[in-house]
């Protein structure tokens, strides 16, 4: 689960992290009032969407030369004008795709006198089972370019969660950022505070970009992006309350209500599979046969007829879907139950696109018999390769 920047900063502040003063705003008037509560004389008006690259982003509705989603304002009138420009408009960034995201809230913060910018992030390294703290002296909006052009400028400090954060980890961060004296001590302390926040709230990713040194010698978290492990949210009702469903795909929200793992993609073949690994293999083989998956959808190991019906409805809610491939390997899950769900779903949604089904595993013959006797135009497949070839052929035939 993702949260907005202003929420991330409020959370980090509870762990002692230094952040600029700021207030969220839902209207232009609220943005003006937020600015009046801050000392100024410079304010920063920030679009709040669940995507990075806001500073270099562009608003669809504004002229091409208009500023992006992070703007300096030198007067209250500029705050008002910038807020009016952003609210209700669609911000397109490197992370949103061409569709962009509508800006429904802003974050007005105090300006900072910046001397230097740095980069610091933390994430779970699943390969090693450790926490990776990634730092660079090249902070700011172009960290992706730094990673591409000069990867040697990015350092990784690995922390074993069983050992926890130790002083030498903090010193390694400060050394990598080339900080000395009091700034070195601040960096050591900040690294520990961020680690504590990361662990205590079950974050999966924390990105500070930029971390700045101000002209008066202070380290300040100027921007923060946070994601949480959704599987751990039951332990954090306070964090779950921060969820902004307007930033999420409605189909993904509906899928979560049925305990379905659904991610919308840009292709035209809808996929319903049990197991993440099999789902990824299914998507790969669709691409191998010349078309692209419209989604990742894992129904899990305990799918019921109702769950399968919901999965079909979610897949077909995407108007780009031109065909559906169901690929089920029934171990815990019974193929006859899946077949019943497929038949019920196809009838309920009045299926109008080609459907190819590959079943294997527990009660597979009963499942195949149910599909064959359903009277529905369901194409059966014997294996994964056969299924991919058939769905591509059926979609092309229907075009």
UniProtKB/Swiss-Prot annotation:
Keywords: ATP-binding, Ligase, Magnesium, Metal-binding, Nucleotide-binding, Tricarboxylic acid cycle
Pathway this chain belongs to: Carbohydrate metabolism; tricarboxylic acid cycle; succinate from succinyl-CoA (ligase route): step 1/1
InterPro entries attached to this UniProt entry: ATP-grasp (IPR011761), ATP-grasp_succ-CoA_synth-type (IPR013650), ATP_grasp_subdomain_1 (IPR013815), SUCC_ACL_C (IPR005811), Succ_CoA_ligase-like_bsu (IPR005809), Succinyl-CoA_synth-like (IPR016102)
Gene3D superfamilies xref list: ATP-grasp fold, A domain, ATP-grasp fold, B domain, Succinyl-CoA synthetase domains
Pfam families assigned to the protein according to its UniProt record, in alphabetical order: ATP-grasp_2 (PF08442), Ligase_CoA (PF00549)
Gene Ontology terms: biological process: succinyl-CoA metabolic process; tricarboxylic acid cycle
Domain ATP-grasp: 9-254
Catalytic activity from the UniProt record: succinate + ATP + CoA = succinyl-CoA + ADP + phosphate; GTP + succinate + CoA = succinyl-CoA + GDP + phosphate
EC number: 6.2.1.5
Positions contributing to substrate binding: 274, 331-333
Enzyme class: ligase
Gene Ontology CC: cytosol; succinate-CoA ligase complex
Cofactor(s) the protein requires to work: Mg(2+)
MF term (GO), any: succinate-CoA ligase (ADP-forming) activity
Binding site for ATP: 46, 53-55, 112, 117
Amino-acid positions noted as binding Mg(2+) in the UniProt annotation, renumbered to this chain: 209, 223
Residue ranges the record marks as coiled coil: none
Family: Belongs to the succinate/malate CoA ligase beta subunit family.
Summary of the function given for this chain in its UniProt record: Succinyl-CoA synthetase functions in the citric acid cycle (TCA), coupling the hydrolysis of succinyl-CoA to the synthesis of either ATP or GTP and thus represents the only step of substrate-level phosphorylation in the TCA. The beta subunit provides nucleotide specificity of the enzyme and binds the substrate succinate, while the binding sites for coenzyme A and phosphate are found in the alpha subunit.
Subunit structure as annotated in this protein's UniProt entry: Heterotetramer of two alpha and two beta subunits.
UniProt-listed PANTHER family: SUCCINATE--COA LIGASE [GDP-FORMING] SUBUNIT BETA, MITOCHONDRIAL, SUCCINYL-COA SYNTHETASE BETA CHAIN
Name of the protein in its database record: Succinate--CoA ligase [ADP-forming] subunit beta
Organism: Rhizorhabdus wittichii (strain DSM 6014 / CCUG 31198 / JCM 15750 / NBRC 105917 / EY 4224 / RW1)
């Amino acid at each position: 689960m993702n949260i907005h920047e202003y929420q991330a900063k409020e959370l980090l502040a509870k762990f002692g992290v230094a952040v600029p003063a700021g207030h969220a705003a839902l209207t232009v008037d609220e943005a003006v009032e937020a600015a009046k509560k801050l000392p100024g004389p410079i304010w920063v008006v920030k679009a709040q969407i669940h995507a990075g690259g806001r500073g270099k982003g562009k608003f669809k509705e504004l002229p091409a030369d208009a500023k992006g989603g992070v703007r300096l304002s030198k007067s209250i009138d500029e705050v008002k004008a910038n807020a009016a420009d952003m609210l209700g408009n669609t911000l397109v960034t490197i992370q949103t795709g061409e569709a962009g995201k509508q800006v429904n809230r802003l974050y007005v913060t105090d300006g900072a006198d910046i001397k230097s910018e740095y980069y610091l992030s933390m994430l779970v390294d699943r390969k090693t089972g450790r926490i990776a703290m990634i730092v660079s002296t090249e902070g700011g909006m172009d960290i992706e370019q730094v990673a591409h052009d000069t990867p040697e400028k990015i350092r990784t400090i690995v922390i074993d969660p069983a050992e926890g954060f130790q002083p030498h980890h903090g010193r390694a961060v400060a050394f990598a950022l080339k900080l000395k004296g009091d700034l070195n001590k601040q960096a050591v302390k900040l690294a520990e505070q961020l680690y504590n926040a990361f662990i205590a709230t079950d974050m999966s990713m924390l990105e500070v970009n930029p971390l700045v040194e101000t002209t008066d010698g202070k380290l300040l978290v100027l921007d923060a992006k946070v994601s949480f492990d959704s599987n751990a949210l039951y332990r954090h009702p306070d964090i779950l309350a921060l969820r902004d469903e307007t930033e999420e795909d409605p189909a993904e929200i509906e899928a979560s209500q049925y305990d379905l793992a659904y991610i919308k993609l840009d292709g035209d073949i809808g996929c319903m599979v049990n197991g993440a690994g099999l789902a990824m293999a299914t998507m790969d083989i669709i691409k191998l046969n010349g078309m692209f998956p419209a989604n990742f959808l894992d129904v899990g190991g305990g799918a019921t007829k109702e769950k399968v019906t919901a999965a079909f409805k979610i897949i077909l809610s995407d108007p780009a879907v031109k065909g559906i491939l169901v690929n089920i390997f029934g171990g815990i899950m019974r193929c006859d139950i899946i077949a019943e769900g497929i038949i019920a779903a196809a009838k309920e949604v009045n299926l109008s696109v080609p459907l190819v089904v590959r079943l294997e595993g527990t009660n597979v013959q009963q499942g195949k018999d149910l599909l064959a006797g359903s009277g529905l135009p369901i194409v059966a497949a014997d294996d994964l390769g056969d299924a991919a070839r058939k769905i591509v052929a059926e979609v092309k035939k229907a075009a």
